[in-house]
């Protein structure tokens, strides 16, 4: 049972956009004045806001995250070529990091209106009256939005609060027409959680085999409008995103290395994706992180500052809006080094908000203490408390899917899969779990195809290689996103089955995969017959003739193998046999056996 106690207070006056010094270039079209104050605008004329401000801002154009990451990597490679100094060691200093993660919940409805939560539709097509803060409209909490939030909290071992409340966080900006954001500052719905980071998660070496990170609280809050900057300080606003439900996850400052901080964000994203709580990951803008960074001298007395109940810390700074795991790690490194340099020079650290640009080597100041906003938190008088029944919590706990740690152990230990540590980790992290689901489908189909071969299936590792590396390589080369329908699981399983039965060669299997990937609608069996890909092994005599030919052409390398024991060069000879013979008929293992026999036998 989820119940929202309604407030009896009347409508609370909203700030008009005009009071904030902005201009409506084109008004919203409104055809009805229904007292409920809720409406889906999908059937209304398209409405847009053109907001002009007098505040000068940068005119940088929007750059997709994928391109930003490529530019960041390019900048770092350029810095290395210039002979940049190796990273400094700071053994005398203790770094402390706390993280705040904002994640978009995967829901159909908005948090406080019945409008659709879809944000990729036509701009301003999913907008209720409350979303744009029209006078008289009131928030209407949608209980369904709480379900993914509860799954996220339970997955991170939080204590669910039976009663939670919403508060107003006041600030003025064009993306928030009400003049405040609704959040849960005082009484969040979840507290006192924790996650466990292990070595395979990518934590720092000094953290040993594992480290536990506390979760102070998780709170629900509404998202803001999406703004697009145009020349002449003009902004276009899309209110489809307003009131889309978010959760903010606040960790305790128990992280002491940049690598572990990045691993923490990565692990939280994996947890959220595994329980279906979020829409997309960091790479698509579904998550963003703020980090709080402080340092203190190990040899000196504890610092004077306290943060979330942990005392003895140095003065912290906050770095806002980090959009990738690499950005989290690099920004912390840069800010740590900056703070240490300031303190070693006799200066002091100011509590301030700082920013980070992809590819940069240092953080930049956004605002200091004097510029900090007084948010004037207050309970929202239009929203009553949210009461969560024990039956809801128990039901969600019973239906909880496997979490990343359990998935990892299953993939590396279950004989059905037996993936390497690296492949298991990658499989879990890719494509919001869709790649893992596809992999498991291929394995299950392949098991059905190979019931006649052996009672003990051992093809899971081979399937992992094909899903991650062969199919993944085609996706990367073509710059296409993941789509399980491009190569159906049945088709890939049939290709791997033919290869394991030695009915086709490895090169033929890759050709088959490429043809299916490119849209060939024929069945795998039909392609094999039409393209004459079925493997016809060479006779022993043919193998010997080819081996003797490549040995005759390369006597020096034969001598090096015989006299110096450079057996690794036999692989090169196998490649030459494939080159001068029919590659689709050459079996690498048999070719190597013949070569070893001829080269080493004559040596003895």
UniProtKB/Swiss-Prot annotation:
Subcellular location: Mitochondrion
Keyword presence, Zinc: no
Enzyme Commission identifier(s): 6.3.5.-
Pfam families noted in UniProt: GatB_N, GatB_Yqey
Top-level EC class: ligase
Segments of skewed composition (Polar residues): 33-46
Secretion signal, residue range per the UniProt entry: none
Complexes and interactors: Subunit of the heterotrimeric GatCAB amidotransferase (AdT) complex, composed of A, B and C subunits.
Catalytic activity: L-glutamyl-tRNA(Gln) + L-glutamine + ATP + H2O = L-glutaminyl-tRNA(Gln) + L-glutamate + ADP + phosphate + H(+)
Entry GO terms, CC: glutamyl-tRNA(Gln) amidotransferase complex; mitochondrion
Transit peptide start-stop: 1-48
A molecular function GO annotation: ATP binding
HAMAP family, per database record: GatB (MF_00121)
Similarity comment: family membership: Belongs to the GatB/GatE family. GatB subfamily.
Chain's role: Allows the formation of correctly charged Gln-tRNA(Gln) through the transamidation of misacylated Glu-tRNA(Gln) in the mitochondria. The reaction takes place in the presence of glutamine and ATP through an activated gamma-phospho-Glu-tRNA(Gln).
Segments of this protein annotated with the region Disordered: 28-57
Organism expressing this protein natively: Ajellomyces dermatitidis (strain ER-3 / ATCC MYA-2586) (Blastomyces dermatitidis)
SMART domains reported in the protein's UniProt record: GatB_Yqey (SM00845)
Domain of life: Eukaryota
UniProt-recorded name of the protein: Glutamyl-tRNA(Gln) amidotransferase subunit B, mitochondrial
UniProt keyword terms in alphabetical order: ATP-binding, Ligase, Mitochondrion, Nucleotide-binding, Protein biosynthesis, Transit peptide
GO BP field: glutaminyl-tRNAGln biosynthesis via transamidation; mitochondrial translation
């Amino acid at each position: 049972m989820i119940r929202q106690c309604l407030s009896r207070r009347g409508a609370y006056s909203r700030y008009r956009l005009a009071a904030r010094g902005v201009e409506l270039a084109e008004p919203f079209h409104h055809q009805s004045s229904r007292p409920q104050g809720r409406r889906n605008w999908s059937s209304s004329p398209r409405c847009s806001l053109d907001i002009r401000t007098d505040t000068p801002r940068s005119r940088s154009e929007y750059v997709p995250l994928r391109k930003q990451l490529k530019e960041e990597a390019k900048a770092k490679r350029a810095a290395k070529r210039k002979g940049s100094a190796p990273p400094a060691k700071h053994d005398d200093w203790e770094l402390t990091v706390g993280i705040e993660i904002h994640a978009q919940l995967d829901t159909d409805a908005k948090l406080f209106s019945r409008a659709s939560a879809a944000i990729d539709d036509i701009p301003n097509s999913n907008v209720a009256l409350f979303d744009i803060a029209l006078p008289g409209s009131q928030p209407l909490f949608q209980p369904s939005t709480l379900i993914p939030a509860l799954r996220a909290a339970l997955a991170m071992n939080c204590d669910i609060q039976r009663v939670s409340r919403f508060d107003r966080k006041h600030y003025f900006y064009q993306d928030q027409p009400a003049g405040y954001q609704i959040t849960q500052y005082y009484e969040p719905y979840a507290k006192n959680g924790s996650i466990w980071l292990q070595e395979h998660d990518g934590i720092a070496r000094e953290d040993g085999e594992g480290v536990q990170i506390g979760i102070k609280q998780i709170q629900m809050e509404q998202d803001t409008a999406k703004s697009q900057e145009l020349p002449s300080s003009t902004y276009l606003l899309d209110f489809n995103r307003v009131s889309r439900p978010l959760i903010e996850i606040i960790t305790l400052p128990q992280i002491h290395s940049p690598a572990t901080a990045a691993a923490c964000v990565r692990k939280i994203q994996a947890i959220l994706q595994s329980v279906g709580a979020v829409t997309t990951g960091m790479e698509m803008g579904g998550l963003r992180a703020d980090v709080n960074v402080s340092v203190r001298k190990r040899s000196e007395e504890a610092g004077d500052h306290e943060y979330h109940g942990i005392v003895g810390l140095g003065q912290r700074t906050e770095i806002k809006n980090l959009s990738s795991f690499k950005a989290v790690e690099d920004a912390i490194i840069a800010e740590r080094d900056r703070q240490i340099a300031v303190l070693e020079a006799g200066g002091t650290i100011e509590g301030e908000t700082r920013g980070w640009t992809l590819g940069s080597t240092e953080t930049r100041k956004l605002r200091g203490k004097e510029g900090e906003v007084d948010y004037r938190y207050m309970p929202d008088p239009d929203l009553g408390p949210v009461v969560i029944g024990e039956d809801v919590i128990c039901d969600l706990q019973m239906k909880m899917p496997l979490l990343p740690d359990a998935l990892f152990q299953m993939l590396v230990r279950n004989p059905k899969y037996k993936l390497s540590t690296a492949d298991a980790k990658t499989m879990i992290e890719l494509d919001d779990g869709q790649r893992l689901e596809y992999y498991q489908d291929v394995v299950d189909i392949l098991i059905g195809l190979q019931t006649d071969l052996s009672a003990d299936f051992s093809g899971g590792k081979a399937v992992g290689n094909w899903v991650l590396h062969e199919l993944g390589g085609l996706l990367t080369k073509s710059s296409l996103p993941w789509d399980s329908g491009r190569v159906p699981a049945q088709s890939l399983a049939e290709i791997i089955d033919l290869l394991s039965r030695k009915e086709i060669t490895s090169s033929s299997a890759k050709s088959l995969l490429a043809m299916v990937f490119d849209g060939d609608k024929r069945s795998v069996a039909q392609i094999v017959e039409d393209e004459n890909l079925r493997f016809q092994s060479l006779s022993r005599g043919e193998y010997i003739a080819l081996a003797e030919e490549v040995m005759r052409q390369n006597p020096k390398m034969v001598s090096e193998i015989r006299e110096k024991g450079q057996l690794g060069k036999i692989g090169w000879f196998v490649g030459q046999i494939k080159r001068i013979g029919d590659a689709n008929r050459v079996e690498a293992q048999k070719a190597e056996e013949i070569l070893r026999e001829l080269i080493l036998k004559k040596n003895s």
